[in-house]
């Protein structure tokens, strides 16, 4: 075990632990059994039993440490001590390996350093780590390969050198001597296995460069083809993926008839159908995209193989081998279908006809005579997925044809121009010159006409009048989902994405259906993160292709930065960053949303927002300066913690470097004081001013605008920030300025004291007013409470009057009424003079 691969050490550690547990010293074994029995009787849980096991092992190890070899140990005790010593050694080795693994995290960061020497040293570490078989070497090299996209050529060369040293060359040979072919193939499979999409792209770039330079032996690809044919599990697909990467630089690796036959039999044949190995089918689609388009020739064996391959590609694209009862199967098929359709557009002589056959076949299988509500959701999802991807590929195919025509015309025009130059050199007749120039002008007109026709095809034909247009209304119906008739998450995800792909083709179709997409985004369930994340990415593509159509909906795109899902917020910020830096979206107006991302809970979101502002600050006009007033205003009006606000502004104000910008920003901030509705907003403004650099002109600006902020100086926060500005200004060491600063400081302190007195007086007046208001309210409440008593007494009086009328003669009625009135008057006089007078009258 001379290397640092942890696997054999872990296996040895397990063996030693098992030996110690089964060969405990007698005294420890008895104590262990007694403790275990007691624990079981007490009903202790598994965690307690595991702790007991660990304690027993610790006691056994301590017992072995106490043994002295010089004491003539018996063979059993000697063996036990030897095993325990081995166990301790192996555990120490694993701890040592863990130390290296933990340290590798810092080296990952060094790979991103702006200092090229840091990058070089980190690469050297991962090369050595690979030679010692440390696991961190592979993960480190995967991250290092992202530097293949660096603009610095020397960095790319260092990465390629490290790649060769780690995976291709014999250790210590400096890349001159190669490992055996099967070892190189194994290393490449290890690198590509379980790699992410971004990692695979970087690996492909590195392998392509090495193949062009001839630094990967040809026998390696023969071994990989054998692994594709006879491998097991995922190794087949991984081997074919690596082959496709190499074929990007050398088509001959895939293009021969025998290789194509292997692809047909292995990746698109019975094996894939039986095991539903969509990863292998996907790899086959990628590999076939490296092959030249088939030329119809029935006598050519290669064409006949390609013809059969195209048939199988259509079978895979239709989903004929999918299982409707298995959702995972369909999810894996999606990726394979995309690459297979891409391969059809590369190798098929007439890809549009092949795609039409796929669509008609899927339409019959999916809908047939049934309504859309009766269709199996997975079948419908597969159908929509194919529709969307074919629409997108038709657009790309149309534009590629336009490019081919444009290149042919350019070549033809260049030839005519050369002829014209030659004719002029020979002083030919002017009529001939005029004729050639006329032909050149006509060529330009023809080229413009061709481009117009291509644009018209994309705008009107693909999703407007062609076969795909038939299914546009169906897509819209499912995406809108009125009445919640479709409840399959996969169906809603694929239908929304397919509609977005349709919209990428035509600007008019896009403008018409943008409201549908945004309604679907708003109605998306909180649990369906995939739908919202995919929709945001699709909207980014639409904004890049049709910025004018998407521009009115920009605020709704920014609103996704407040989504509850971290994934959605990440994707939204990445999309907006891409659009803003490419000037496809205006940042002003919603910039506050991006500024808030600087304090997001997710580290990647915080880093991305920092990167965006950093890139903006590097532009000549420094947009950050122009955005700051809006950011300050909007952040002051929303509910945000003071520390968060100040953290955001401290970061952004650090980008204001020019003196003139500092002066103008201070003036703009001063003008905002009268517009503030609370003292906290004024404190925020003064904090921002305190972070800026000051000079004589900015100090004069603050002094001249004293009346704008004097009413806020009673606040300790506001006063403290102004005093900090004065402290910074005093360091300018100009005598005449120091006198002005002292006068300004004295003025600030006086106004602060006066403001505090006014504040206290106002608070006392408010307290007195509140107390008077309480008394008035209490008096009114008492009056309201007496009304029911008055009504009750009036009812009593009415009852008495009724009794008197019933008991007396009519001739004495007048006398009795007067008597009762006198009684009422007497009662009422207790409650108020007004009521008493009324009764008396």
Describe the predicted segments one by one:
Residues 839-841:
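A positional/structural detector of protein chain ends, strongest at the extreme C-terminus
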Residues 772-781, 816-834:
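Arg/Lys-rich low-complexity patches in intrinsically disordered regions that function as generic
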